[in-house]
Amino acid sequence: METAGKAKKGFGGRKGGPRKKSVTRSVKAGLQFPVGRIGRYLKKGRYAQRVGTGAPVYLAAVLEYLAAEVLELAGNAARDNKKTRIIPRHLLLAVRNDEELGKLLAGVTFAHGGVLPNINPVLLPKKTAEKAAKEPKSPSKAGKSPKKA
């Protein structure tokens, strides 16, 4: 038997030996979002007959950027409210207070998000009445006491 001295072949013609650790496409692209899973969803969803190799990488990068942007703003909103945990209310405040994200997610309803605080200026008390109450009377009138005759 001649095969006793040679290394066995395996894995479709490659030489035997220790197998290399597989590197995911997410790692190659430097992303946290799963490129392979997004590619599978693109194919399974039948959005097109064929899906290019760069499409899931690009889509994963875009989704990761949007998620990071929303989470950063929501974290700021949580910190402003002196909280350490992001809740749906913070997500709503973050998205609605940002002009571009507000346009992108205009038709989205956030469960348990509440509403933006907004009071119509007509309903607010008049500023002139506040100023008149705070200002002291003129010193010439306020400083003099009535003279006794």
From Swiss-Prot:
Keywords: Chromosome, DNA-binding, Nucleosome core, Nucleus. Residues 1-25, 127-149 are annotated as: Disordered. The keyword Nucleus applies. Residues 127-138 have a biased composition (Basic and acidic residues). GO terms for cellular component: nucleosome; nucleus. One of its GO terms (molecular function) is structural constituent of chromatin. It is found in: Nucleus; Chromosome. A motif (SPKK motif 1) lies at residues 138-141. SUPFAM superfamilies: Histone-fold. A motif (SPKK motif 2) lies at residues 145-148. Residues 1-23 have a biased composition (Basic residues). Core component of nucleosome. Nucleosomes wrap and compact DNA into chromatin, limiting DNA accessibility to the cellular machineries which require DNA as a template. Histones thereby play a central role in transcription regulation, DNA repair, DNA replication and chromosomal stability. DNA accessibility is regulated via a complex set of post-translational modifications of histones, also called histone code, and nucleosome remodeling. Contains 2 SPKK motifs which may interact with the minor groove of A/T-rich DNA sites. Phosphorylation of this motif may regulate DNA binding. This motif is reiterated in both termini of histone H1 and in the N-terminus of sea urchin histones H2B, but its presence in the C-terminus seems to be unique to plant H2A. Belongs to the histone H2A family. The nucleosome is a histone octamer containing two molecules each of H2A, H2B, H3 and H4 assembled in one H3-H4 heterotetramer and two H2A-H2B heterodimers. The octamer wraps approximately 147 bp of DNA. This is Histone H2A. It comes from Petroselinum crispum.
